[in-house]
Each structure stands twice: as structure tokens, then as C-alpha cells.
Amino acid sequence: MSKVLKNALAGYGYNLVALPKEGIAPLLLLYKNKRDVSSSGNNIDKLFALADSPPPIVSKNNATLNLQQNSTVSFDGKAGVDILDWLLQKLKMGKLRGNINADHINSLQISYQNVFEDNVSLLQLDNFISGSEPKVDQFNTFKEKLKDNELFVINSVLKSNSFSVSAQNKNGQNIDLEATIKGIVDADVNVGRSKKDEVLMEYKNATPIVFAFKAQKIIYDHKKWWQFFKKGDAKFRIKDEHGVVLKDESGFPTQSLEETNELINI
């Protein structure tokens, strides 16, 4: 079974995207999928009608100086090689084509470089959701999920178009991947050393892909028994959601654990 061994971003409240890609943005509506979450393919305003306030404006391409040295995710050999191949292809850098044998790798680290954040104001998001009415008649599929607190909305994403990679064998010794990577990436990709044992890959024309996110659980506040004589529906509020993985149904099956110091299965 493939595992995430360590996620440095968890300490900053970020959850992982199983398969980093474009198209993941603040205000995207997610739904519970076993122990993790999946994309509904729609933004939050498709489910909630405008009421007291409009949906918050997305602030894009914000600098993340405190995360530049802390955007590292450590995988076991199989997961690491799979993710490395995925990133190379999504960023149009190249393809492994079996040139790296996962059996020879005990752990592999991906450190995202040139990281930027897109986000929305939590206060504005809370005001929008708490003052809106859901269009449950148009979304029967999500009606019960909304009542059961199984819907989420993204409030922040991290994105990058370059990364570095390092790997170790079963004895804990570093594996030199530079020659192998130089032999498989496209000519336009710059390959160098970010640190002694890390191979850095940069392709300036690559569109950034999202690799981590923050999400808010939408909490349904049921009416109390003494409120049933009042008009109006129950209201909604939001709460930070941690320890989930954003799944792509066409990709790796994932299973997250609540404790950040435990393994996450991918």
C-alpha cells in the first residue's frame, strides 16, 4: 500500500490533493467521500442563493514566504514514483517511462518551489453562507449531504509550477536522481540542484497546479424544538476541516488519518 510518510503542510492547516492539477480553486464545493473529499465540479454559489451578501472575491497569486521552505511531502517509494511521474506529465516536463524503479526507493520527497496561494476571506465566506438559502430543490443529490454536514467549501489553495525531488534507499542513503531525470525531461526544463541531494526542476512556461488546500465544513444548525413555530429555515455556518485528502476518482484511491504524525494511505 502506498503512503504519505510526512506532510509538512499539515502544520499550516493544509490538506493534500491526491493528484495535483489545475481547476481546483477557492469556493469549489466538495463532498464527503468515505473518509476523504471529492469535487462536486461546482462552486458554492451554485448551491446557495444570494441573500444578505455576495460570495467572497478570490484573491489570487499571493506570496507565501513562510511556506517556501515548508512545502515538502514525503512518500514511500511506490507513491513517490507515481506522484513524480504525475507531476512531470501535468507540468509538461516529461515522463518517467519506467526509468526509476520504486523497489529501490524507500522514501521520496517532493518539495514544491515558487509556491503561491489563492484564497478568500473566511469572514466574507461565513457571512455569505450564514446569510444565504440553499437551492436544495435543484440539487437533490446534495440535499441529504448538506443536512448531514457532509459538504465542504475550499477557502485556500497552494499552487506551484516547479519542484525538487530527493530519495533515499532502505539504508537511509541518498539516491542520486539527477542523471536519470536529465535523461527523461524535455529540453526546455531546467534541471539543477536546489540543495546537495535535491534535484530541482523548473519549466517557466508550465501552468501552476494545485497541490494543497484548506476547506471549511458547512455545518447545518438544526432548529431547536422551541424554534419550530418561527418562520425561516435553519441556518448554516462553517468550521475548519483537517486531515482529509481531495480525491480524484480517476486516480489513486486515498485514505487519510486524522493524526498528522501517522501515515496517510494513497
From Swiss-Prot:
The chain crosses the membrane at residues 67-83, 95-113, 162-179, 187-203. One of its GO terms (cellular component) is cytoplasm. Keywords: Antiviral defense, Cell inner membrane, Cell membrane, Cytoplasm, Membrane, Transmembrane, Transmembrane beta strand. GO terms for biological process: defense response to virus. Belongs to the bacterial gasdermin family. The N-terminus has marked structural similarity to the mammalian gasdermin N-terminal domain. The C-terminal region wraps around the twisted beta sheet core, probably stabilizing the inactive state. This is Gasdermin bGSDM. The lineage of its organism: Bacteria, Pseudomonadati, Bacteroidota, Flavobacteriia, Flavobacteriales.
